[in-house]
């Protein structure tokens, strides 16, 4: 049988009885009642119409240099100072000539890239054209060989047979003999 809670050593039961005799909850209640708390203080709120609350104090505005913040996402050419208050990315260079030279350099690079693309396209087109011509030449050679073979077969027939009438009669005889021939049949066991 399974052991029950009641059965066990005598010492364990004595310890359990000793714990039951001491009420812990009652002791903690006594401590809470005896502890004195200071009386709650009343917090007086100031009137909202008081002049000190109505005044707007000016807060100091710090510049970027004073704060020492790093400049992010700011790519400016060397020697160019952006005037404050202007929108980003609109005008970097006050000198129009410098701007035009930079623009001309960028355009020249782009045109070079476009020209190289055009050259590649032309080369690819030439290669395609050459391949197409080769394929046409091969087809022409095949056709010429086929025509030569046909001509040689025709000439051999002409040399063997006497006239064209006998050639016309021969196929009719062959077709009639084929139809009169025995039909093949398959039987399954």
From Swiss-Prot:
Protein's name in the database: 60S ribosomal subunit assembly/export protein loc1
Compositional bias per record (Basic and acidic residues), positions renumbered to this chain: 39-49, 130-151, 166-177
One GO BP annotation of this record: ribosomal large subunit biogenesis
Family named by the database record: Belongs to the LOC1 family.
Compositional bias annotation for Basic residues: 179-189
UniProt GO cellular component terms: nucleolus; preribosome, large subunit precursor
Coiled coil segments of this chain: 106-160
Top-level lineage group: Eukaryota
Record keyword Isomerase present: no
Keywords recorded for this protein, A-Z: Coiled coil, mRNA transport, Nucleus, Ribosome biogenesis, Transport
Organism, as annotated: Aspergillus niger (strain ATCC MYA-4892 / CBS 513.88 / FGSC A1513)
Region (Disordered): 1-69, 130-189
GO molecular function: mRNA binding
The protein's assembly and partners: Component of the 66S pre-ribosomal particle.
Purpose: Required for efficient assembly and nuclear export of the 60S ribosomal subunit.
Major place of residence: nucleus
Subcellular location: Nucleus, Nucleolus
Classification via PANTHER family: 60S RIBOSOMAL SUBUNIT ASSEMBLY/EXPORT PROTEIN LOC1, 60S RIBOSOMAL SUBUNIT ASSEMBLY_EXPORT PROTEIN LOC1
């Amino acid at each position: 049988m399974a052991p029950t809670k009641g059965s066990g050593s005598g010492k364990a039961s004595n310890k359990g009885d000793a714990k039951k005799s001491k009420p812990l909850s009652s002791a903690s209640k006594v401590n809470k009642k005896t502890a004195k708390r200071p009386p709650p203080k009343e917090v007086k709120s100031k009137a909202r119409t008081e002049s000190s609350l109505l005044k707007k104090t000016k807060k100091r505005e710090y510049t970027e240099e004073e704060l020492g913040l790093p400049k992010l996402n700011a790519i400016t050419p060397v020697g160019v100072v952006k005037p404050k208050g202007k929108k980003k990315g609109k005008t970097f260079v006050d000198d129009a000539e410098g701007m035009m030279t930079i623009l001309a350099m960028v355009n020249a690079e782009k045109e070079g890239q476009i020209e190289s693309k055009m050259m590649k396209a032309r080369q690819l087109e030439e290669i395609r054209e050459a391949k197409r011509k080769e394929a046409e030449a091969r087809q022409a050679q095949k056709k010429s060989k086929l025509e030569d073979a046909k001509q040689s077969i025709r000439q051999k027939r002409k040399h063997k047979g006497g006239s064209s009438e006998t050639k016309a009669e021969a196929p009719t005889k062959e077709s009639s003999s084929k139809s009169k021939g025995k039909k093949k049949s398959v039987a399954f066991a």
